Amino acid sequence: MENMKVLLGFICLIVPLLSLETDKCTEYPNEVISFSSVNEIDIRSCPLTPNEMHGGTIIWYKNDSKTPISADKDSRIHQQNEHLWFVPAKMEDSGYYYCIMRNSTYCLKTKITMSVLENDPGLCYNTQASFIQRLHVAGDGSLVCPYLDFFKDENNELPKVQWYKNCKPLPLDDGNFFGFKNKLMVMNVAEEHRGNYTCRTSYTYQGKQYPVTRVITFITIDDSKRDRPVIMSPRNETMEADPGSTIQLICNVTGQFTDLVYWKWNGSEIEWDDPILAEDYQFLEHPSAKRKYTLITTLNVSEVKSQFYRYPFICFVKNTHILETAHVRLVYPVPDFKNYLIGGFAIFTATAVFCACIYKVFKVDIVLWYRDSCSDFLPRKASDGRTYDAYVLYPKTYGEGSFAYLDTFVFKLLPEVLEGQFGYKLFICGRDDYVGEDTIEVTNENVKRSRRLIIILVRDMGSFSCLGQSSEEQIAIYDALIREGIKIILLELEKIQDYEKMPESIQFIKQKHGAICWSGDFKERPQSAKTRFWKNLRYQMPAQRRSPLSKHHLLTLDPVLDTKEKLQAETHLPLG
């Protein structure tokens, strides 16, 4: 399994190299020179900024080799993440190494010259690998053992450091020196303190312990006057934090390397073993000023407690002559009403869309339910002066011919439901007019007295007078569309696919209002008003307050039908 992981890691490194020959990498002109001690473990990072390395892949090469350095942790020289490891460094490792960073848009290349050195004769170090650090005479300061961040343990703690001066153990109990993490604190700096200091530690890698050594050339500065440190952040500010959350407080200072930067809360410094508060230190050379550094002390708060809101966290910057402070006060977050508004608006919109969809699907049922349930509680409308709820217009047969299903629907089924069950009042020519009356006058008068015009259509219009071509139909449609503004309801007793043979007025009504298609049979039996046809027809009819017609009145419809059938052949001439 371990070999498989190594193989996969190597494949992941080698795949981006397939296009190496064709890609042009931008090479940094500045060369980085690095020194290492022979037989010691050493780790080198790619000297690019975090912004330059963001989103990219780091690959290391030695000299002019086209083969990347191995990612196998068992190799003495190998790449681990973006770092180059020497476990340990050997004299033959000297040379130059290329760190190449590439992503989907660009490629950066930087050169590092590596020198692996042996100790100078009679010394425990090589002077070429020395780091120069300076402190002011008569002041307090610290020497820092550099580049130990790579060797933190699993608890993110720096290793224990031993200090030597001129290769002899340095006593840390004489009042002038004491050790603190990776720092050697020097109190009341004097000229005799200058010299070469060595810090030593060790690091265990894959079960084997390797030495780590750094040498520092300590130079004293006679003039103790120095610039005042500047706290870049915080600036006496407040910070919103939720109770129980994890936060970081960053104290960013521009000052001298020896300035102390630390946090206090409620008058006390942060203890090193505090389970909730922990400090982390970092220093960088200032990019725009010589002999100045960016000192960053981060206070990690693993859990915001209620007492943290009572007192501010104070950042202190201290040297021999100056003490600067700045604070951060934690406050409870202000409720973000914007999210509530957005959420409420989203819920309202979703509800509105849902209701609109429900209404569109069940519109007919909702309107009919409202009429049946709430009409008694609404104020009565003023009378519109009309007598009939609908004027029924249907095709007339030529001569003595008759279509029984049409007569059954017009004179039996339609009145039975609309008049018998829902109390509507219909005017049906041939039932409600009198023998001998002028058809044009009857039509003109009764259309004006009706609230709706129901036009009944059948598929085979060839056996009927054409709707809209006889005087009766022309008057009815004209009055409904033009003069009276009456709503027209088209009823298809049979499914009609082609309306091109229909009069233009019928085509216009069909296009604008559609038609209701009959889906039942024409047997003379009680009709259920709960079918979709009758619901759609009732929806198109005006709201009704009257009670259904009595059973006695309904029984009179059949004699009327018989009278119609008997008189039709005698008095009713085909229209058209």
UniProtKB/Swiss-Prot annotation:
Record membrane topology: Single-pass type I membrane protein
Annotated transmembrane regions: 339-359
Domain TIR: 386-541
Enzyme Commission number(s) from the entry: 3.2.2.6
Catalytic activity of the protein: NAD(+) + H2O = ADP-D-ribose + nicotinamide + H(+)
UniProt modified residues of type Phosphotyrosine: Y499
Entry-linked Gene3D superfamilies: Immunoglobulins (2.60.40.10), Toll/interleukin-1 receptor homology (TIR) domain (3.40.50.10140)
Annotated catalytic residues: E473
Main location: membrane
CC annotations in GO: axon; cell surface; external side of plasma membrane; extracellular space; membrane; plasma membrane; protein-containing complex
SMART domains documented for this protein: IG, TIR
Residue intervals annotated with topology Cytoplasmic: 360-576
Any one biological process term the GO annotation gives: regulation of inflammatory response
Glycosylation sites: N63, N103, N236, N252, N266
Cell compartment(s), UniProt: Membrane; Cell membrane; Secreted
Disulfide feature: C25-C107, C46-C99, C145-C199, C251-C315
Keywords: Cell membrane, Disulfide bond, Glycoprotein, Hydrolase, Immunoglobulin domain, Inflammatory response, Membrane, NAD, Phosphoprotein, Receptor, Repeat, Secreted, Signal, Transmembrane, Transmembrane helix
GO MF assignments: interleukin-1 binding; interleukin-1 receptor activity; interleukin-1, type I, activating receptor activity; ionotropic glutamate receptor binding; NAD+ nucleosidase activity, cyclic ADP-ribose generating; platelet-derived growth factor receptor binding; protease binding
Residues recorded as bearing Phosphothreonine in the entry: T556
Function of the protein: Receptor for IL1A, IL1B and IL1RN. After binding to interleukin-1 associates with the coreceptor IL1RAP to form the high affinity interleukin-1 receptor complex which mediates interleukin-1-dependent activation of NF-kappa-B, MAPK and other pathways. Signaling involves the recruitment of adapter molecules such as TOLLIP, MYD88, and IRAK1 or IRAK2 via the respective TIR domains of the receptor/coreceptor subunits. Binds ligands with comparable affinity and binding of antagonist IL1RN prevents association with IL1RAP to form a signaling complex.
Oligomeric and partner information: The interleukin-1 receptor complex is a heterodimer of IL1R1 and IL1RAP. Interacts with PIK3R1. Interacts with IL1A.
Entry domain remark: The TIR domain mediates NAD(+) hydrolase (NADase) activity. Self-association of TIR domains is required for NADase activity.
Full protein name: Interleukin-1 receptor type 1
